[in-house]
From Swiss-Prot:
Positions bound to a carbohydrate: Y12, L99, Y100, R228
Record flagged with keyword Lyase: no
Subunit structure: Homotetramer.
Binding residues for Mn(2+): E8, D10, D19, H24, S34
Role description: Glucose/D-mannose specific lectin. Has anti-inflammatory activity in rats. Induces histamine release in mast cells from hamster and rat. Induces lymphocyte proliferation and IFNG production. Shows toxicity against the aquatic snail B.glabrata at concentrations higher than 20 ug/ml.
Pfam families membership: Lectin_legB
Other observations noted: Binds one manganese (or another transition metal) ion and one calcium ion. The metal ions are essential for the saccharide-binding and cell-agglutinating activities. Is being tested as a molluscicide with potential application in controlling schistosomiasis. The causative agent of schistosomiasis depends on freshwater snails of the genus Biomphalaria as hosts during its larval stages.
Record protein name field: Concanavalin-Br
Amino acid sequence: ADTIVAVELDTYPNTDIGDPSYPHIGIDIKSVRSKKTAKWNMQNGKVGTAHIIYNSVGKRLSAVVSYPNGDSATVSYDVDLDNVLPEWVRVGLSASTGLYKETNTILSWSFTSKLKSNSTHETNALHFMFNQFSKDQKDLILQGDATTGTEGNLRLTRVSSNGSPQGSSVGRALFYAPVHIWESSAVVASFEATFTFLIKSPDSHPADGIAFFISNIDSSIPSGSTGRLLGLFPDAN
C-alpha cells in the first residue's frame, strides 16, 4: 500500500470509522482514521482557503482552513515526517464523492519546500504555483476523474454537463516533479502548501471531502476508495 500523510477537509461524518459527528478537518498519518481533528463549518458554495505548514525543528504539521467571513478551523499534530515518509515524495490533492455528493473544485494551489543542509549551508527548494489550470496542464499528473481547464479550474471529481456533482467519483492531481522532503544531513526540512477550493452541493449532506496529501512517488488511487476513503486509502483501518 502507499504511504500517505494527508490533511483532510472532511465534509461528511463517517462515525463508523472514527470520524467526529460533524464536518471536520483532520490530519491523517497512513490511515483515514485521523490522528487529530477539529470542527469545521463548511460553507456550501463559498470559496475557502486551506494553508498547511510543517517544520522539522518543531516536528509539527498544522493546517488552517478559512473563509472570507473570518470563519476558520485549525488543527495540528506533532509528527516526525522522516520516520513516516520516504525521502522523495509527490504532493497532491485528492477528493471523492459517494452516495452523497459535492463539487470538489480547486481554484489555485501553491507549494514550497526547503531543505537546509549543514554541510554546504545550501538550501534546496522546490516551489510551484497555479493561479489557474489549463486544459492541457503538463506539469500535473491527473488520476481518476480529475480534469483541468473548465473555467481555469481543477475539478477533482465528476460533474455533469450542467455542472451538477456526481456520486461515487474519485480524482487526484499530483505535481509531476518529485519533492525531496527530508534528508539525513538536513538541519531543517520545511514545507508549506496553500489551495483555494469551492465545495458546492445540492444535497443537505455534501460528501465526501478534499485532501492535500504527500505520498510515495508512484502512488495511485486505491481501488474502492471513493466516498469516505477520499481517494487515499484502500480501507478504513
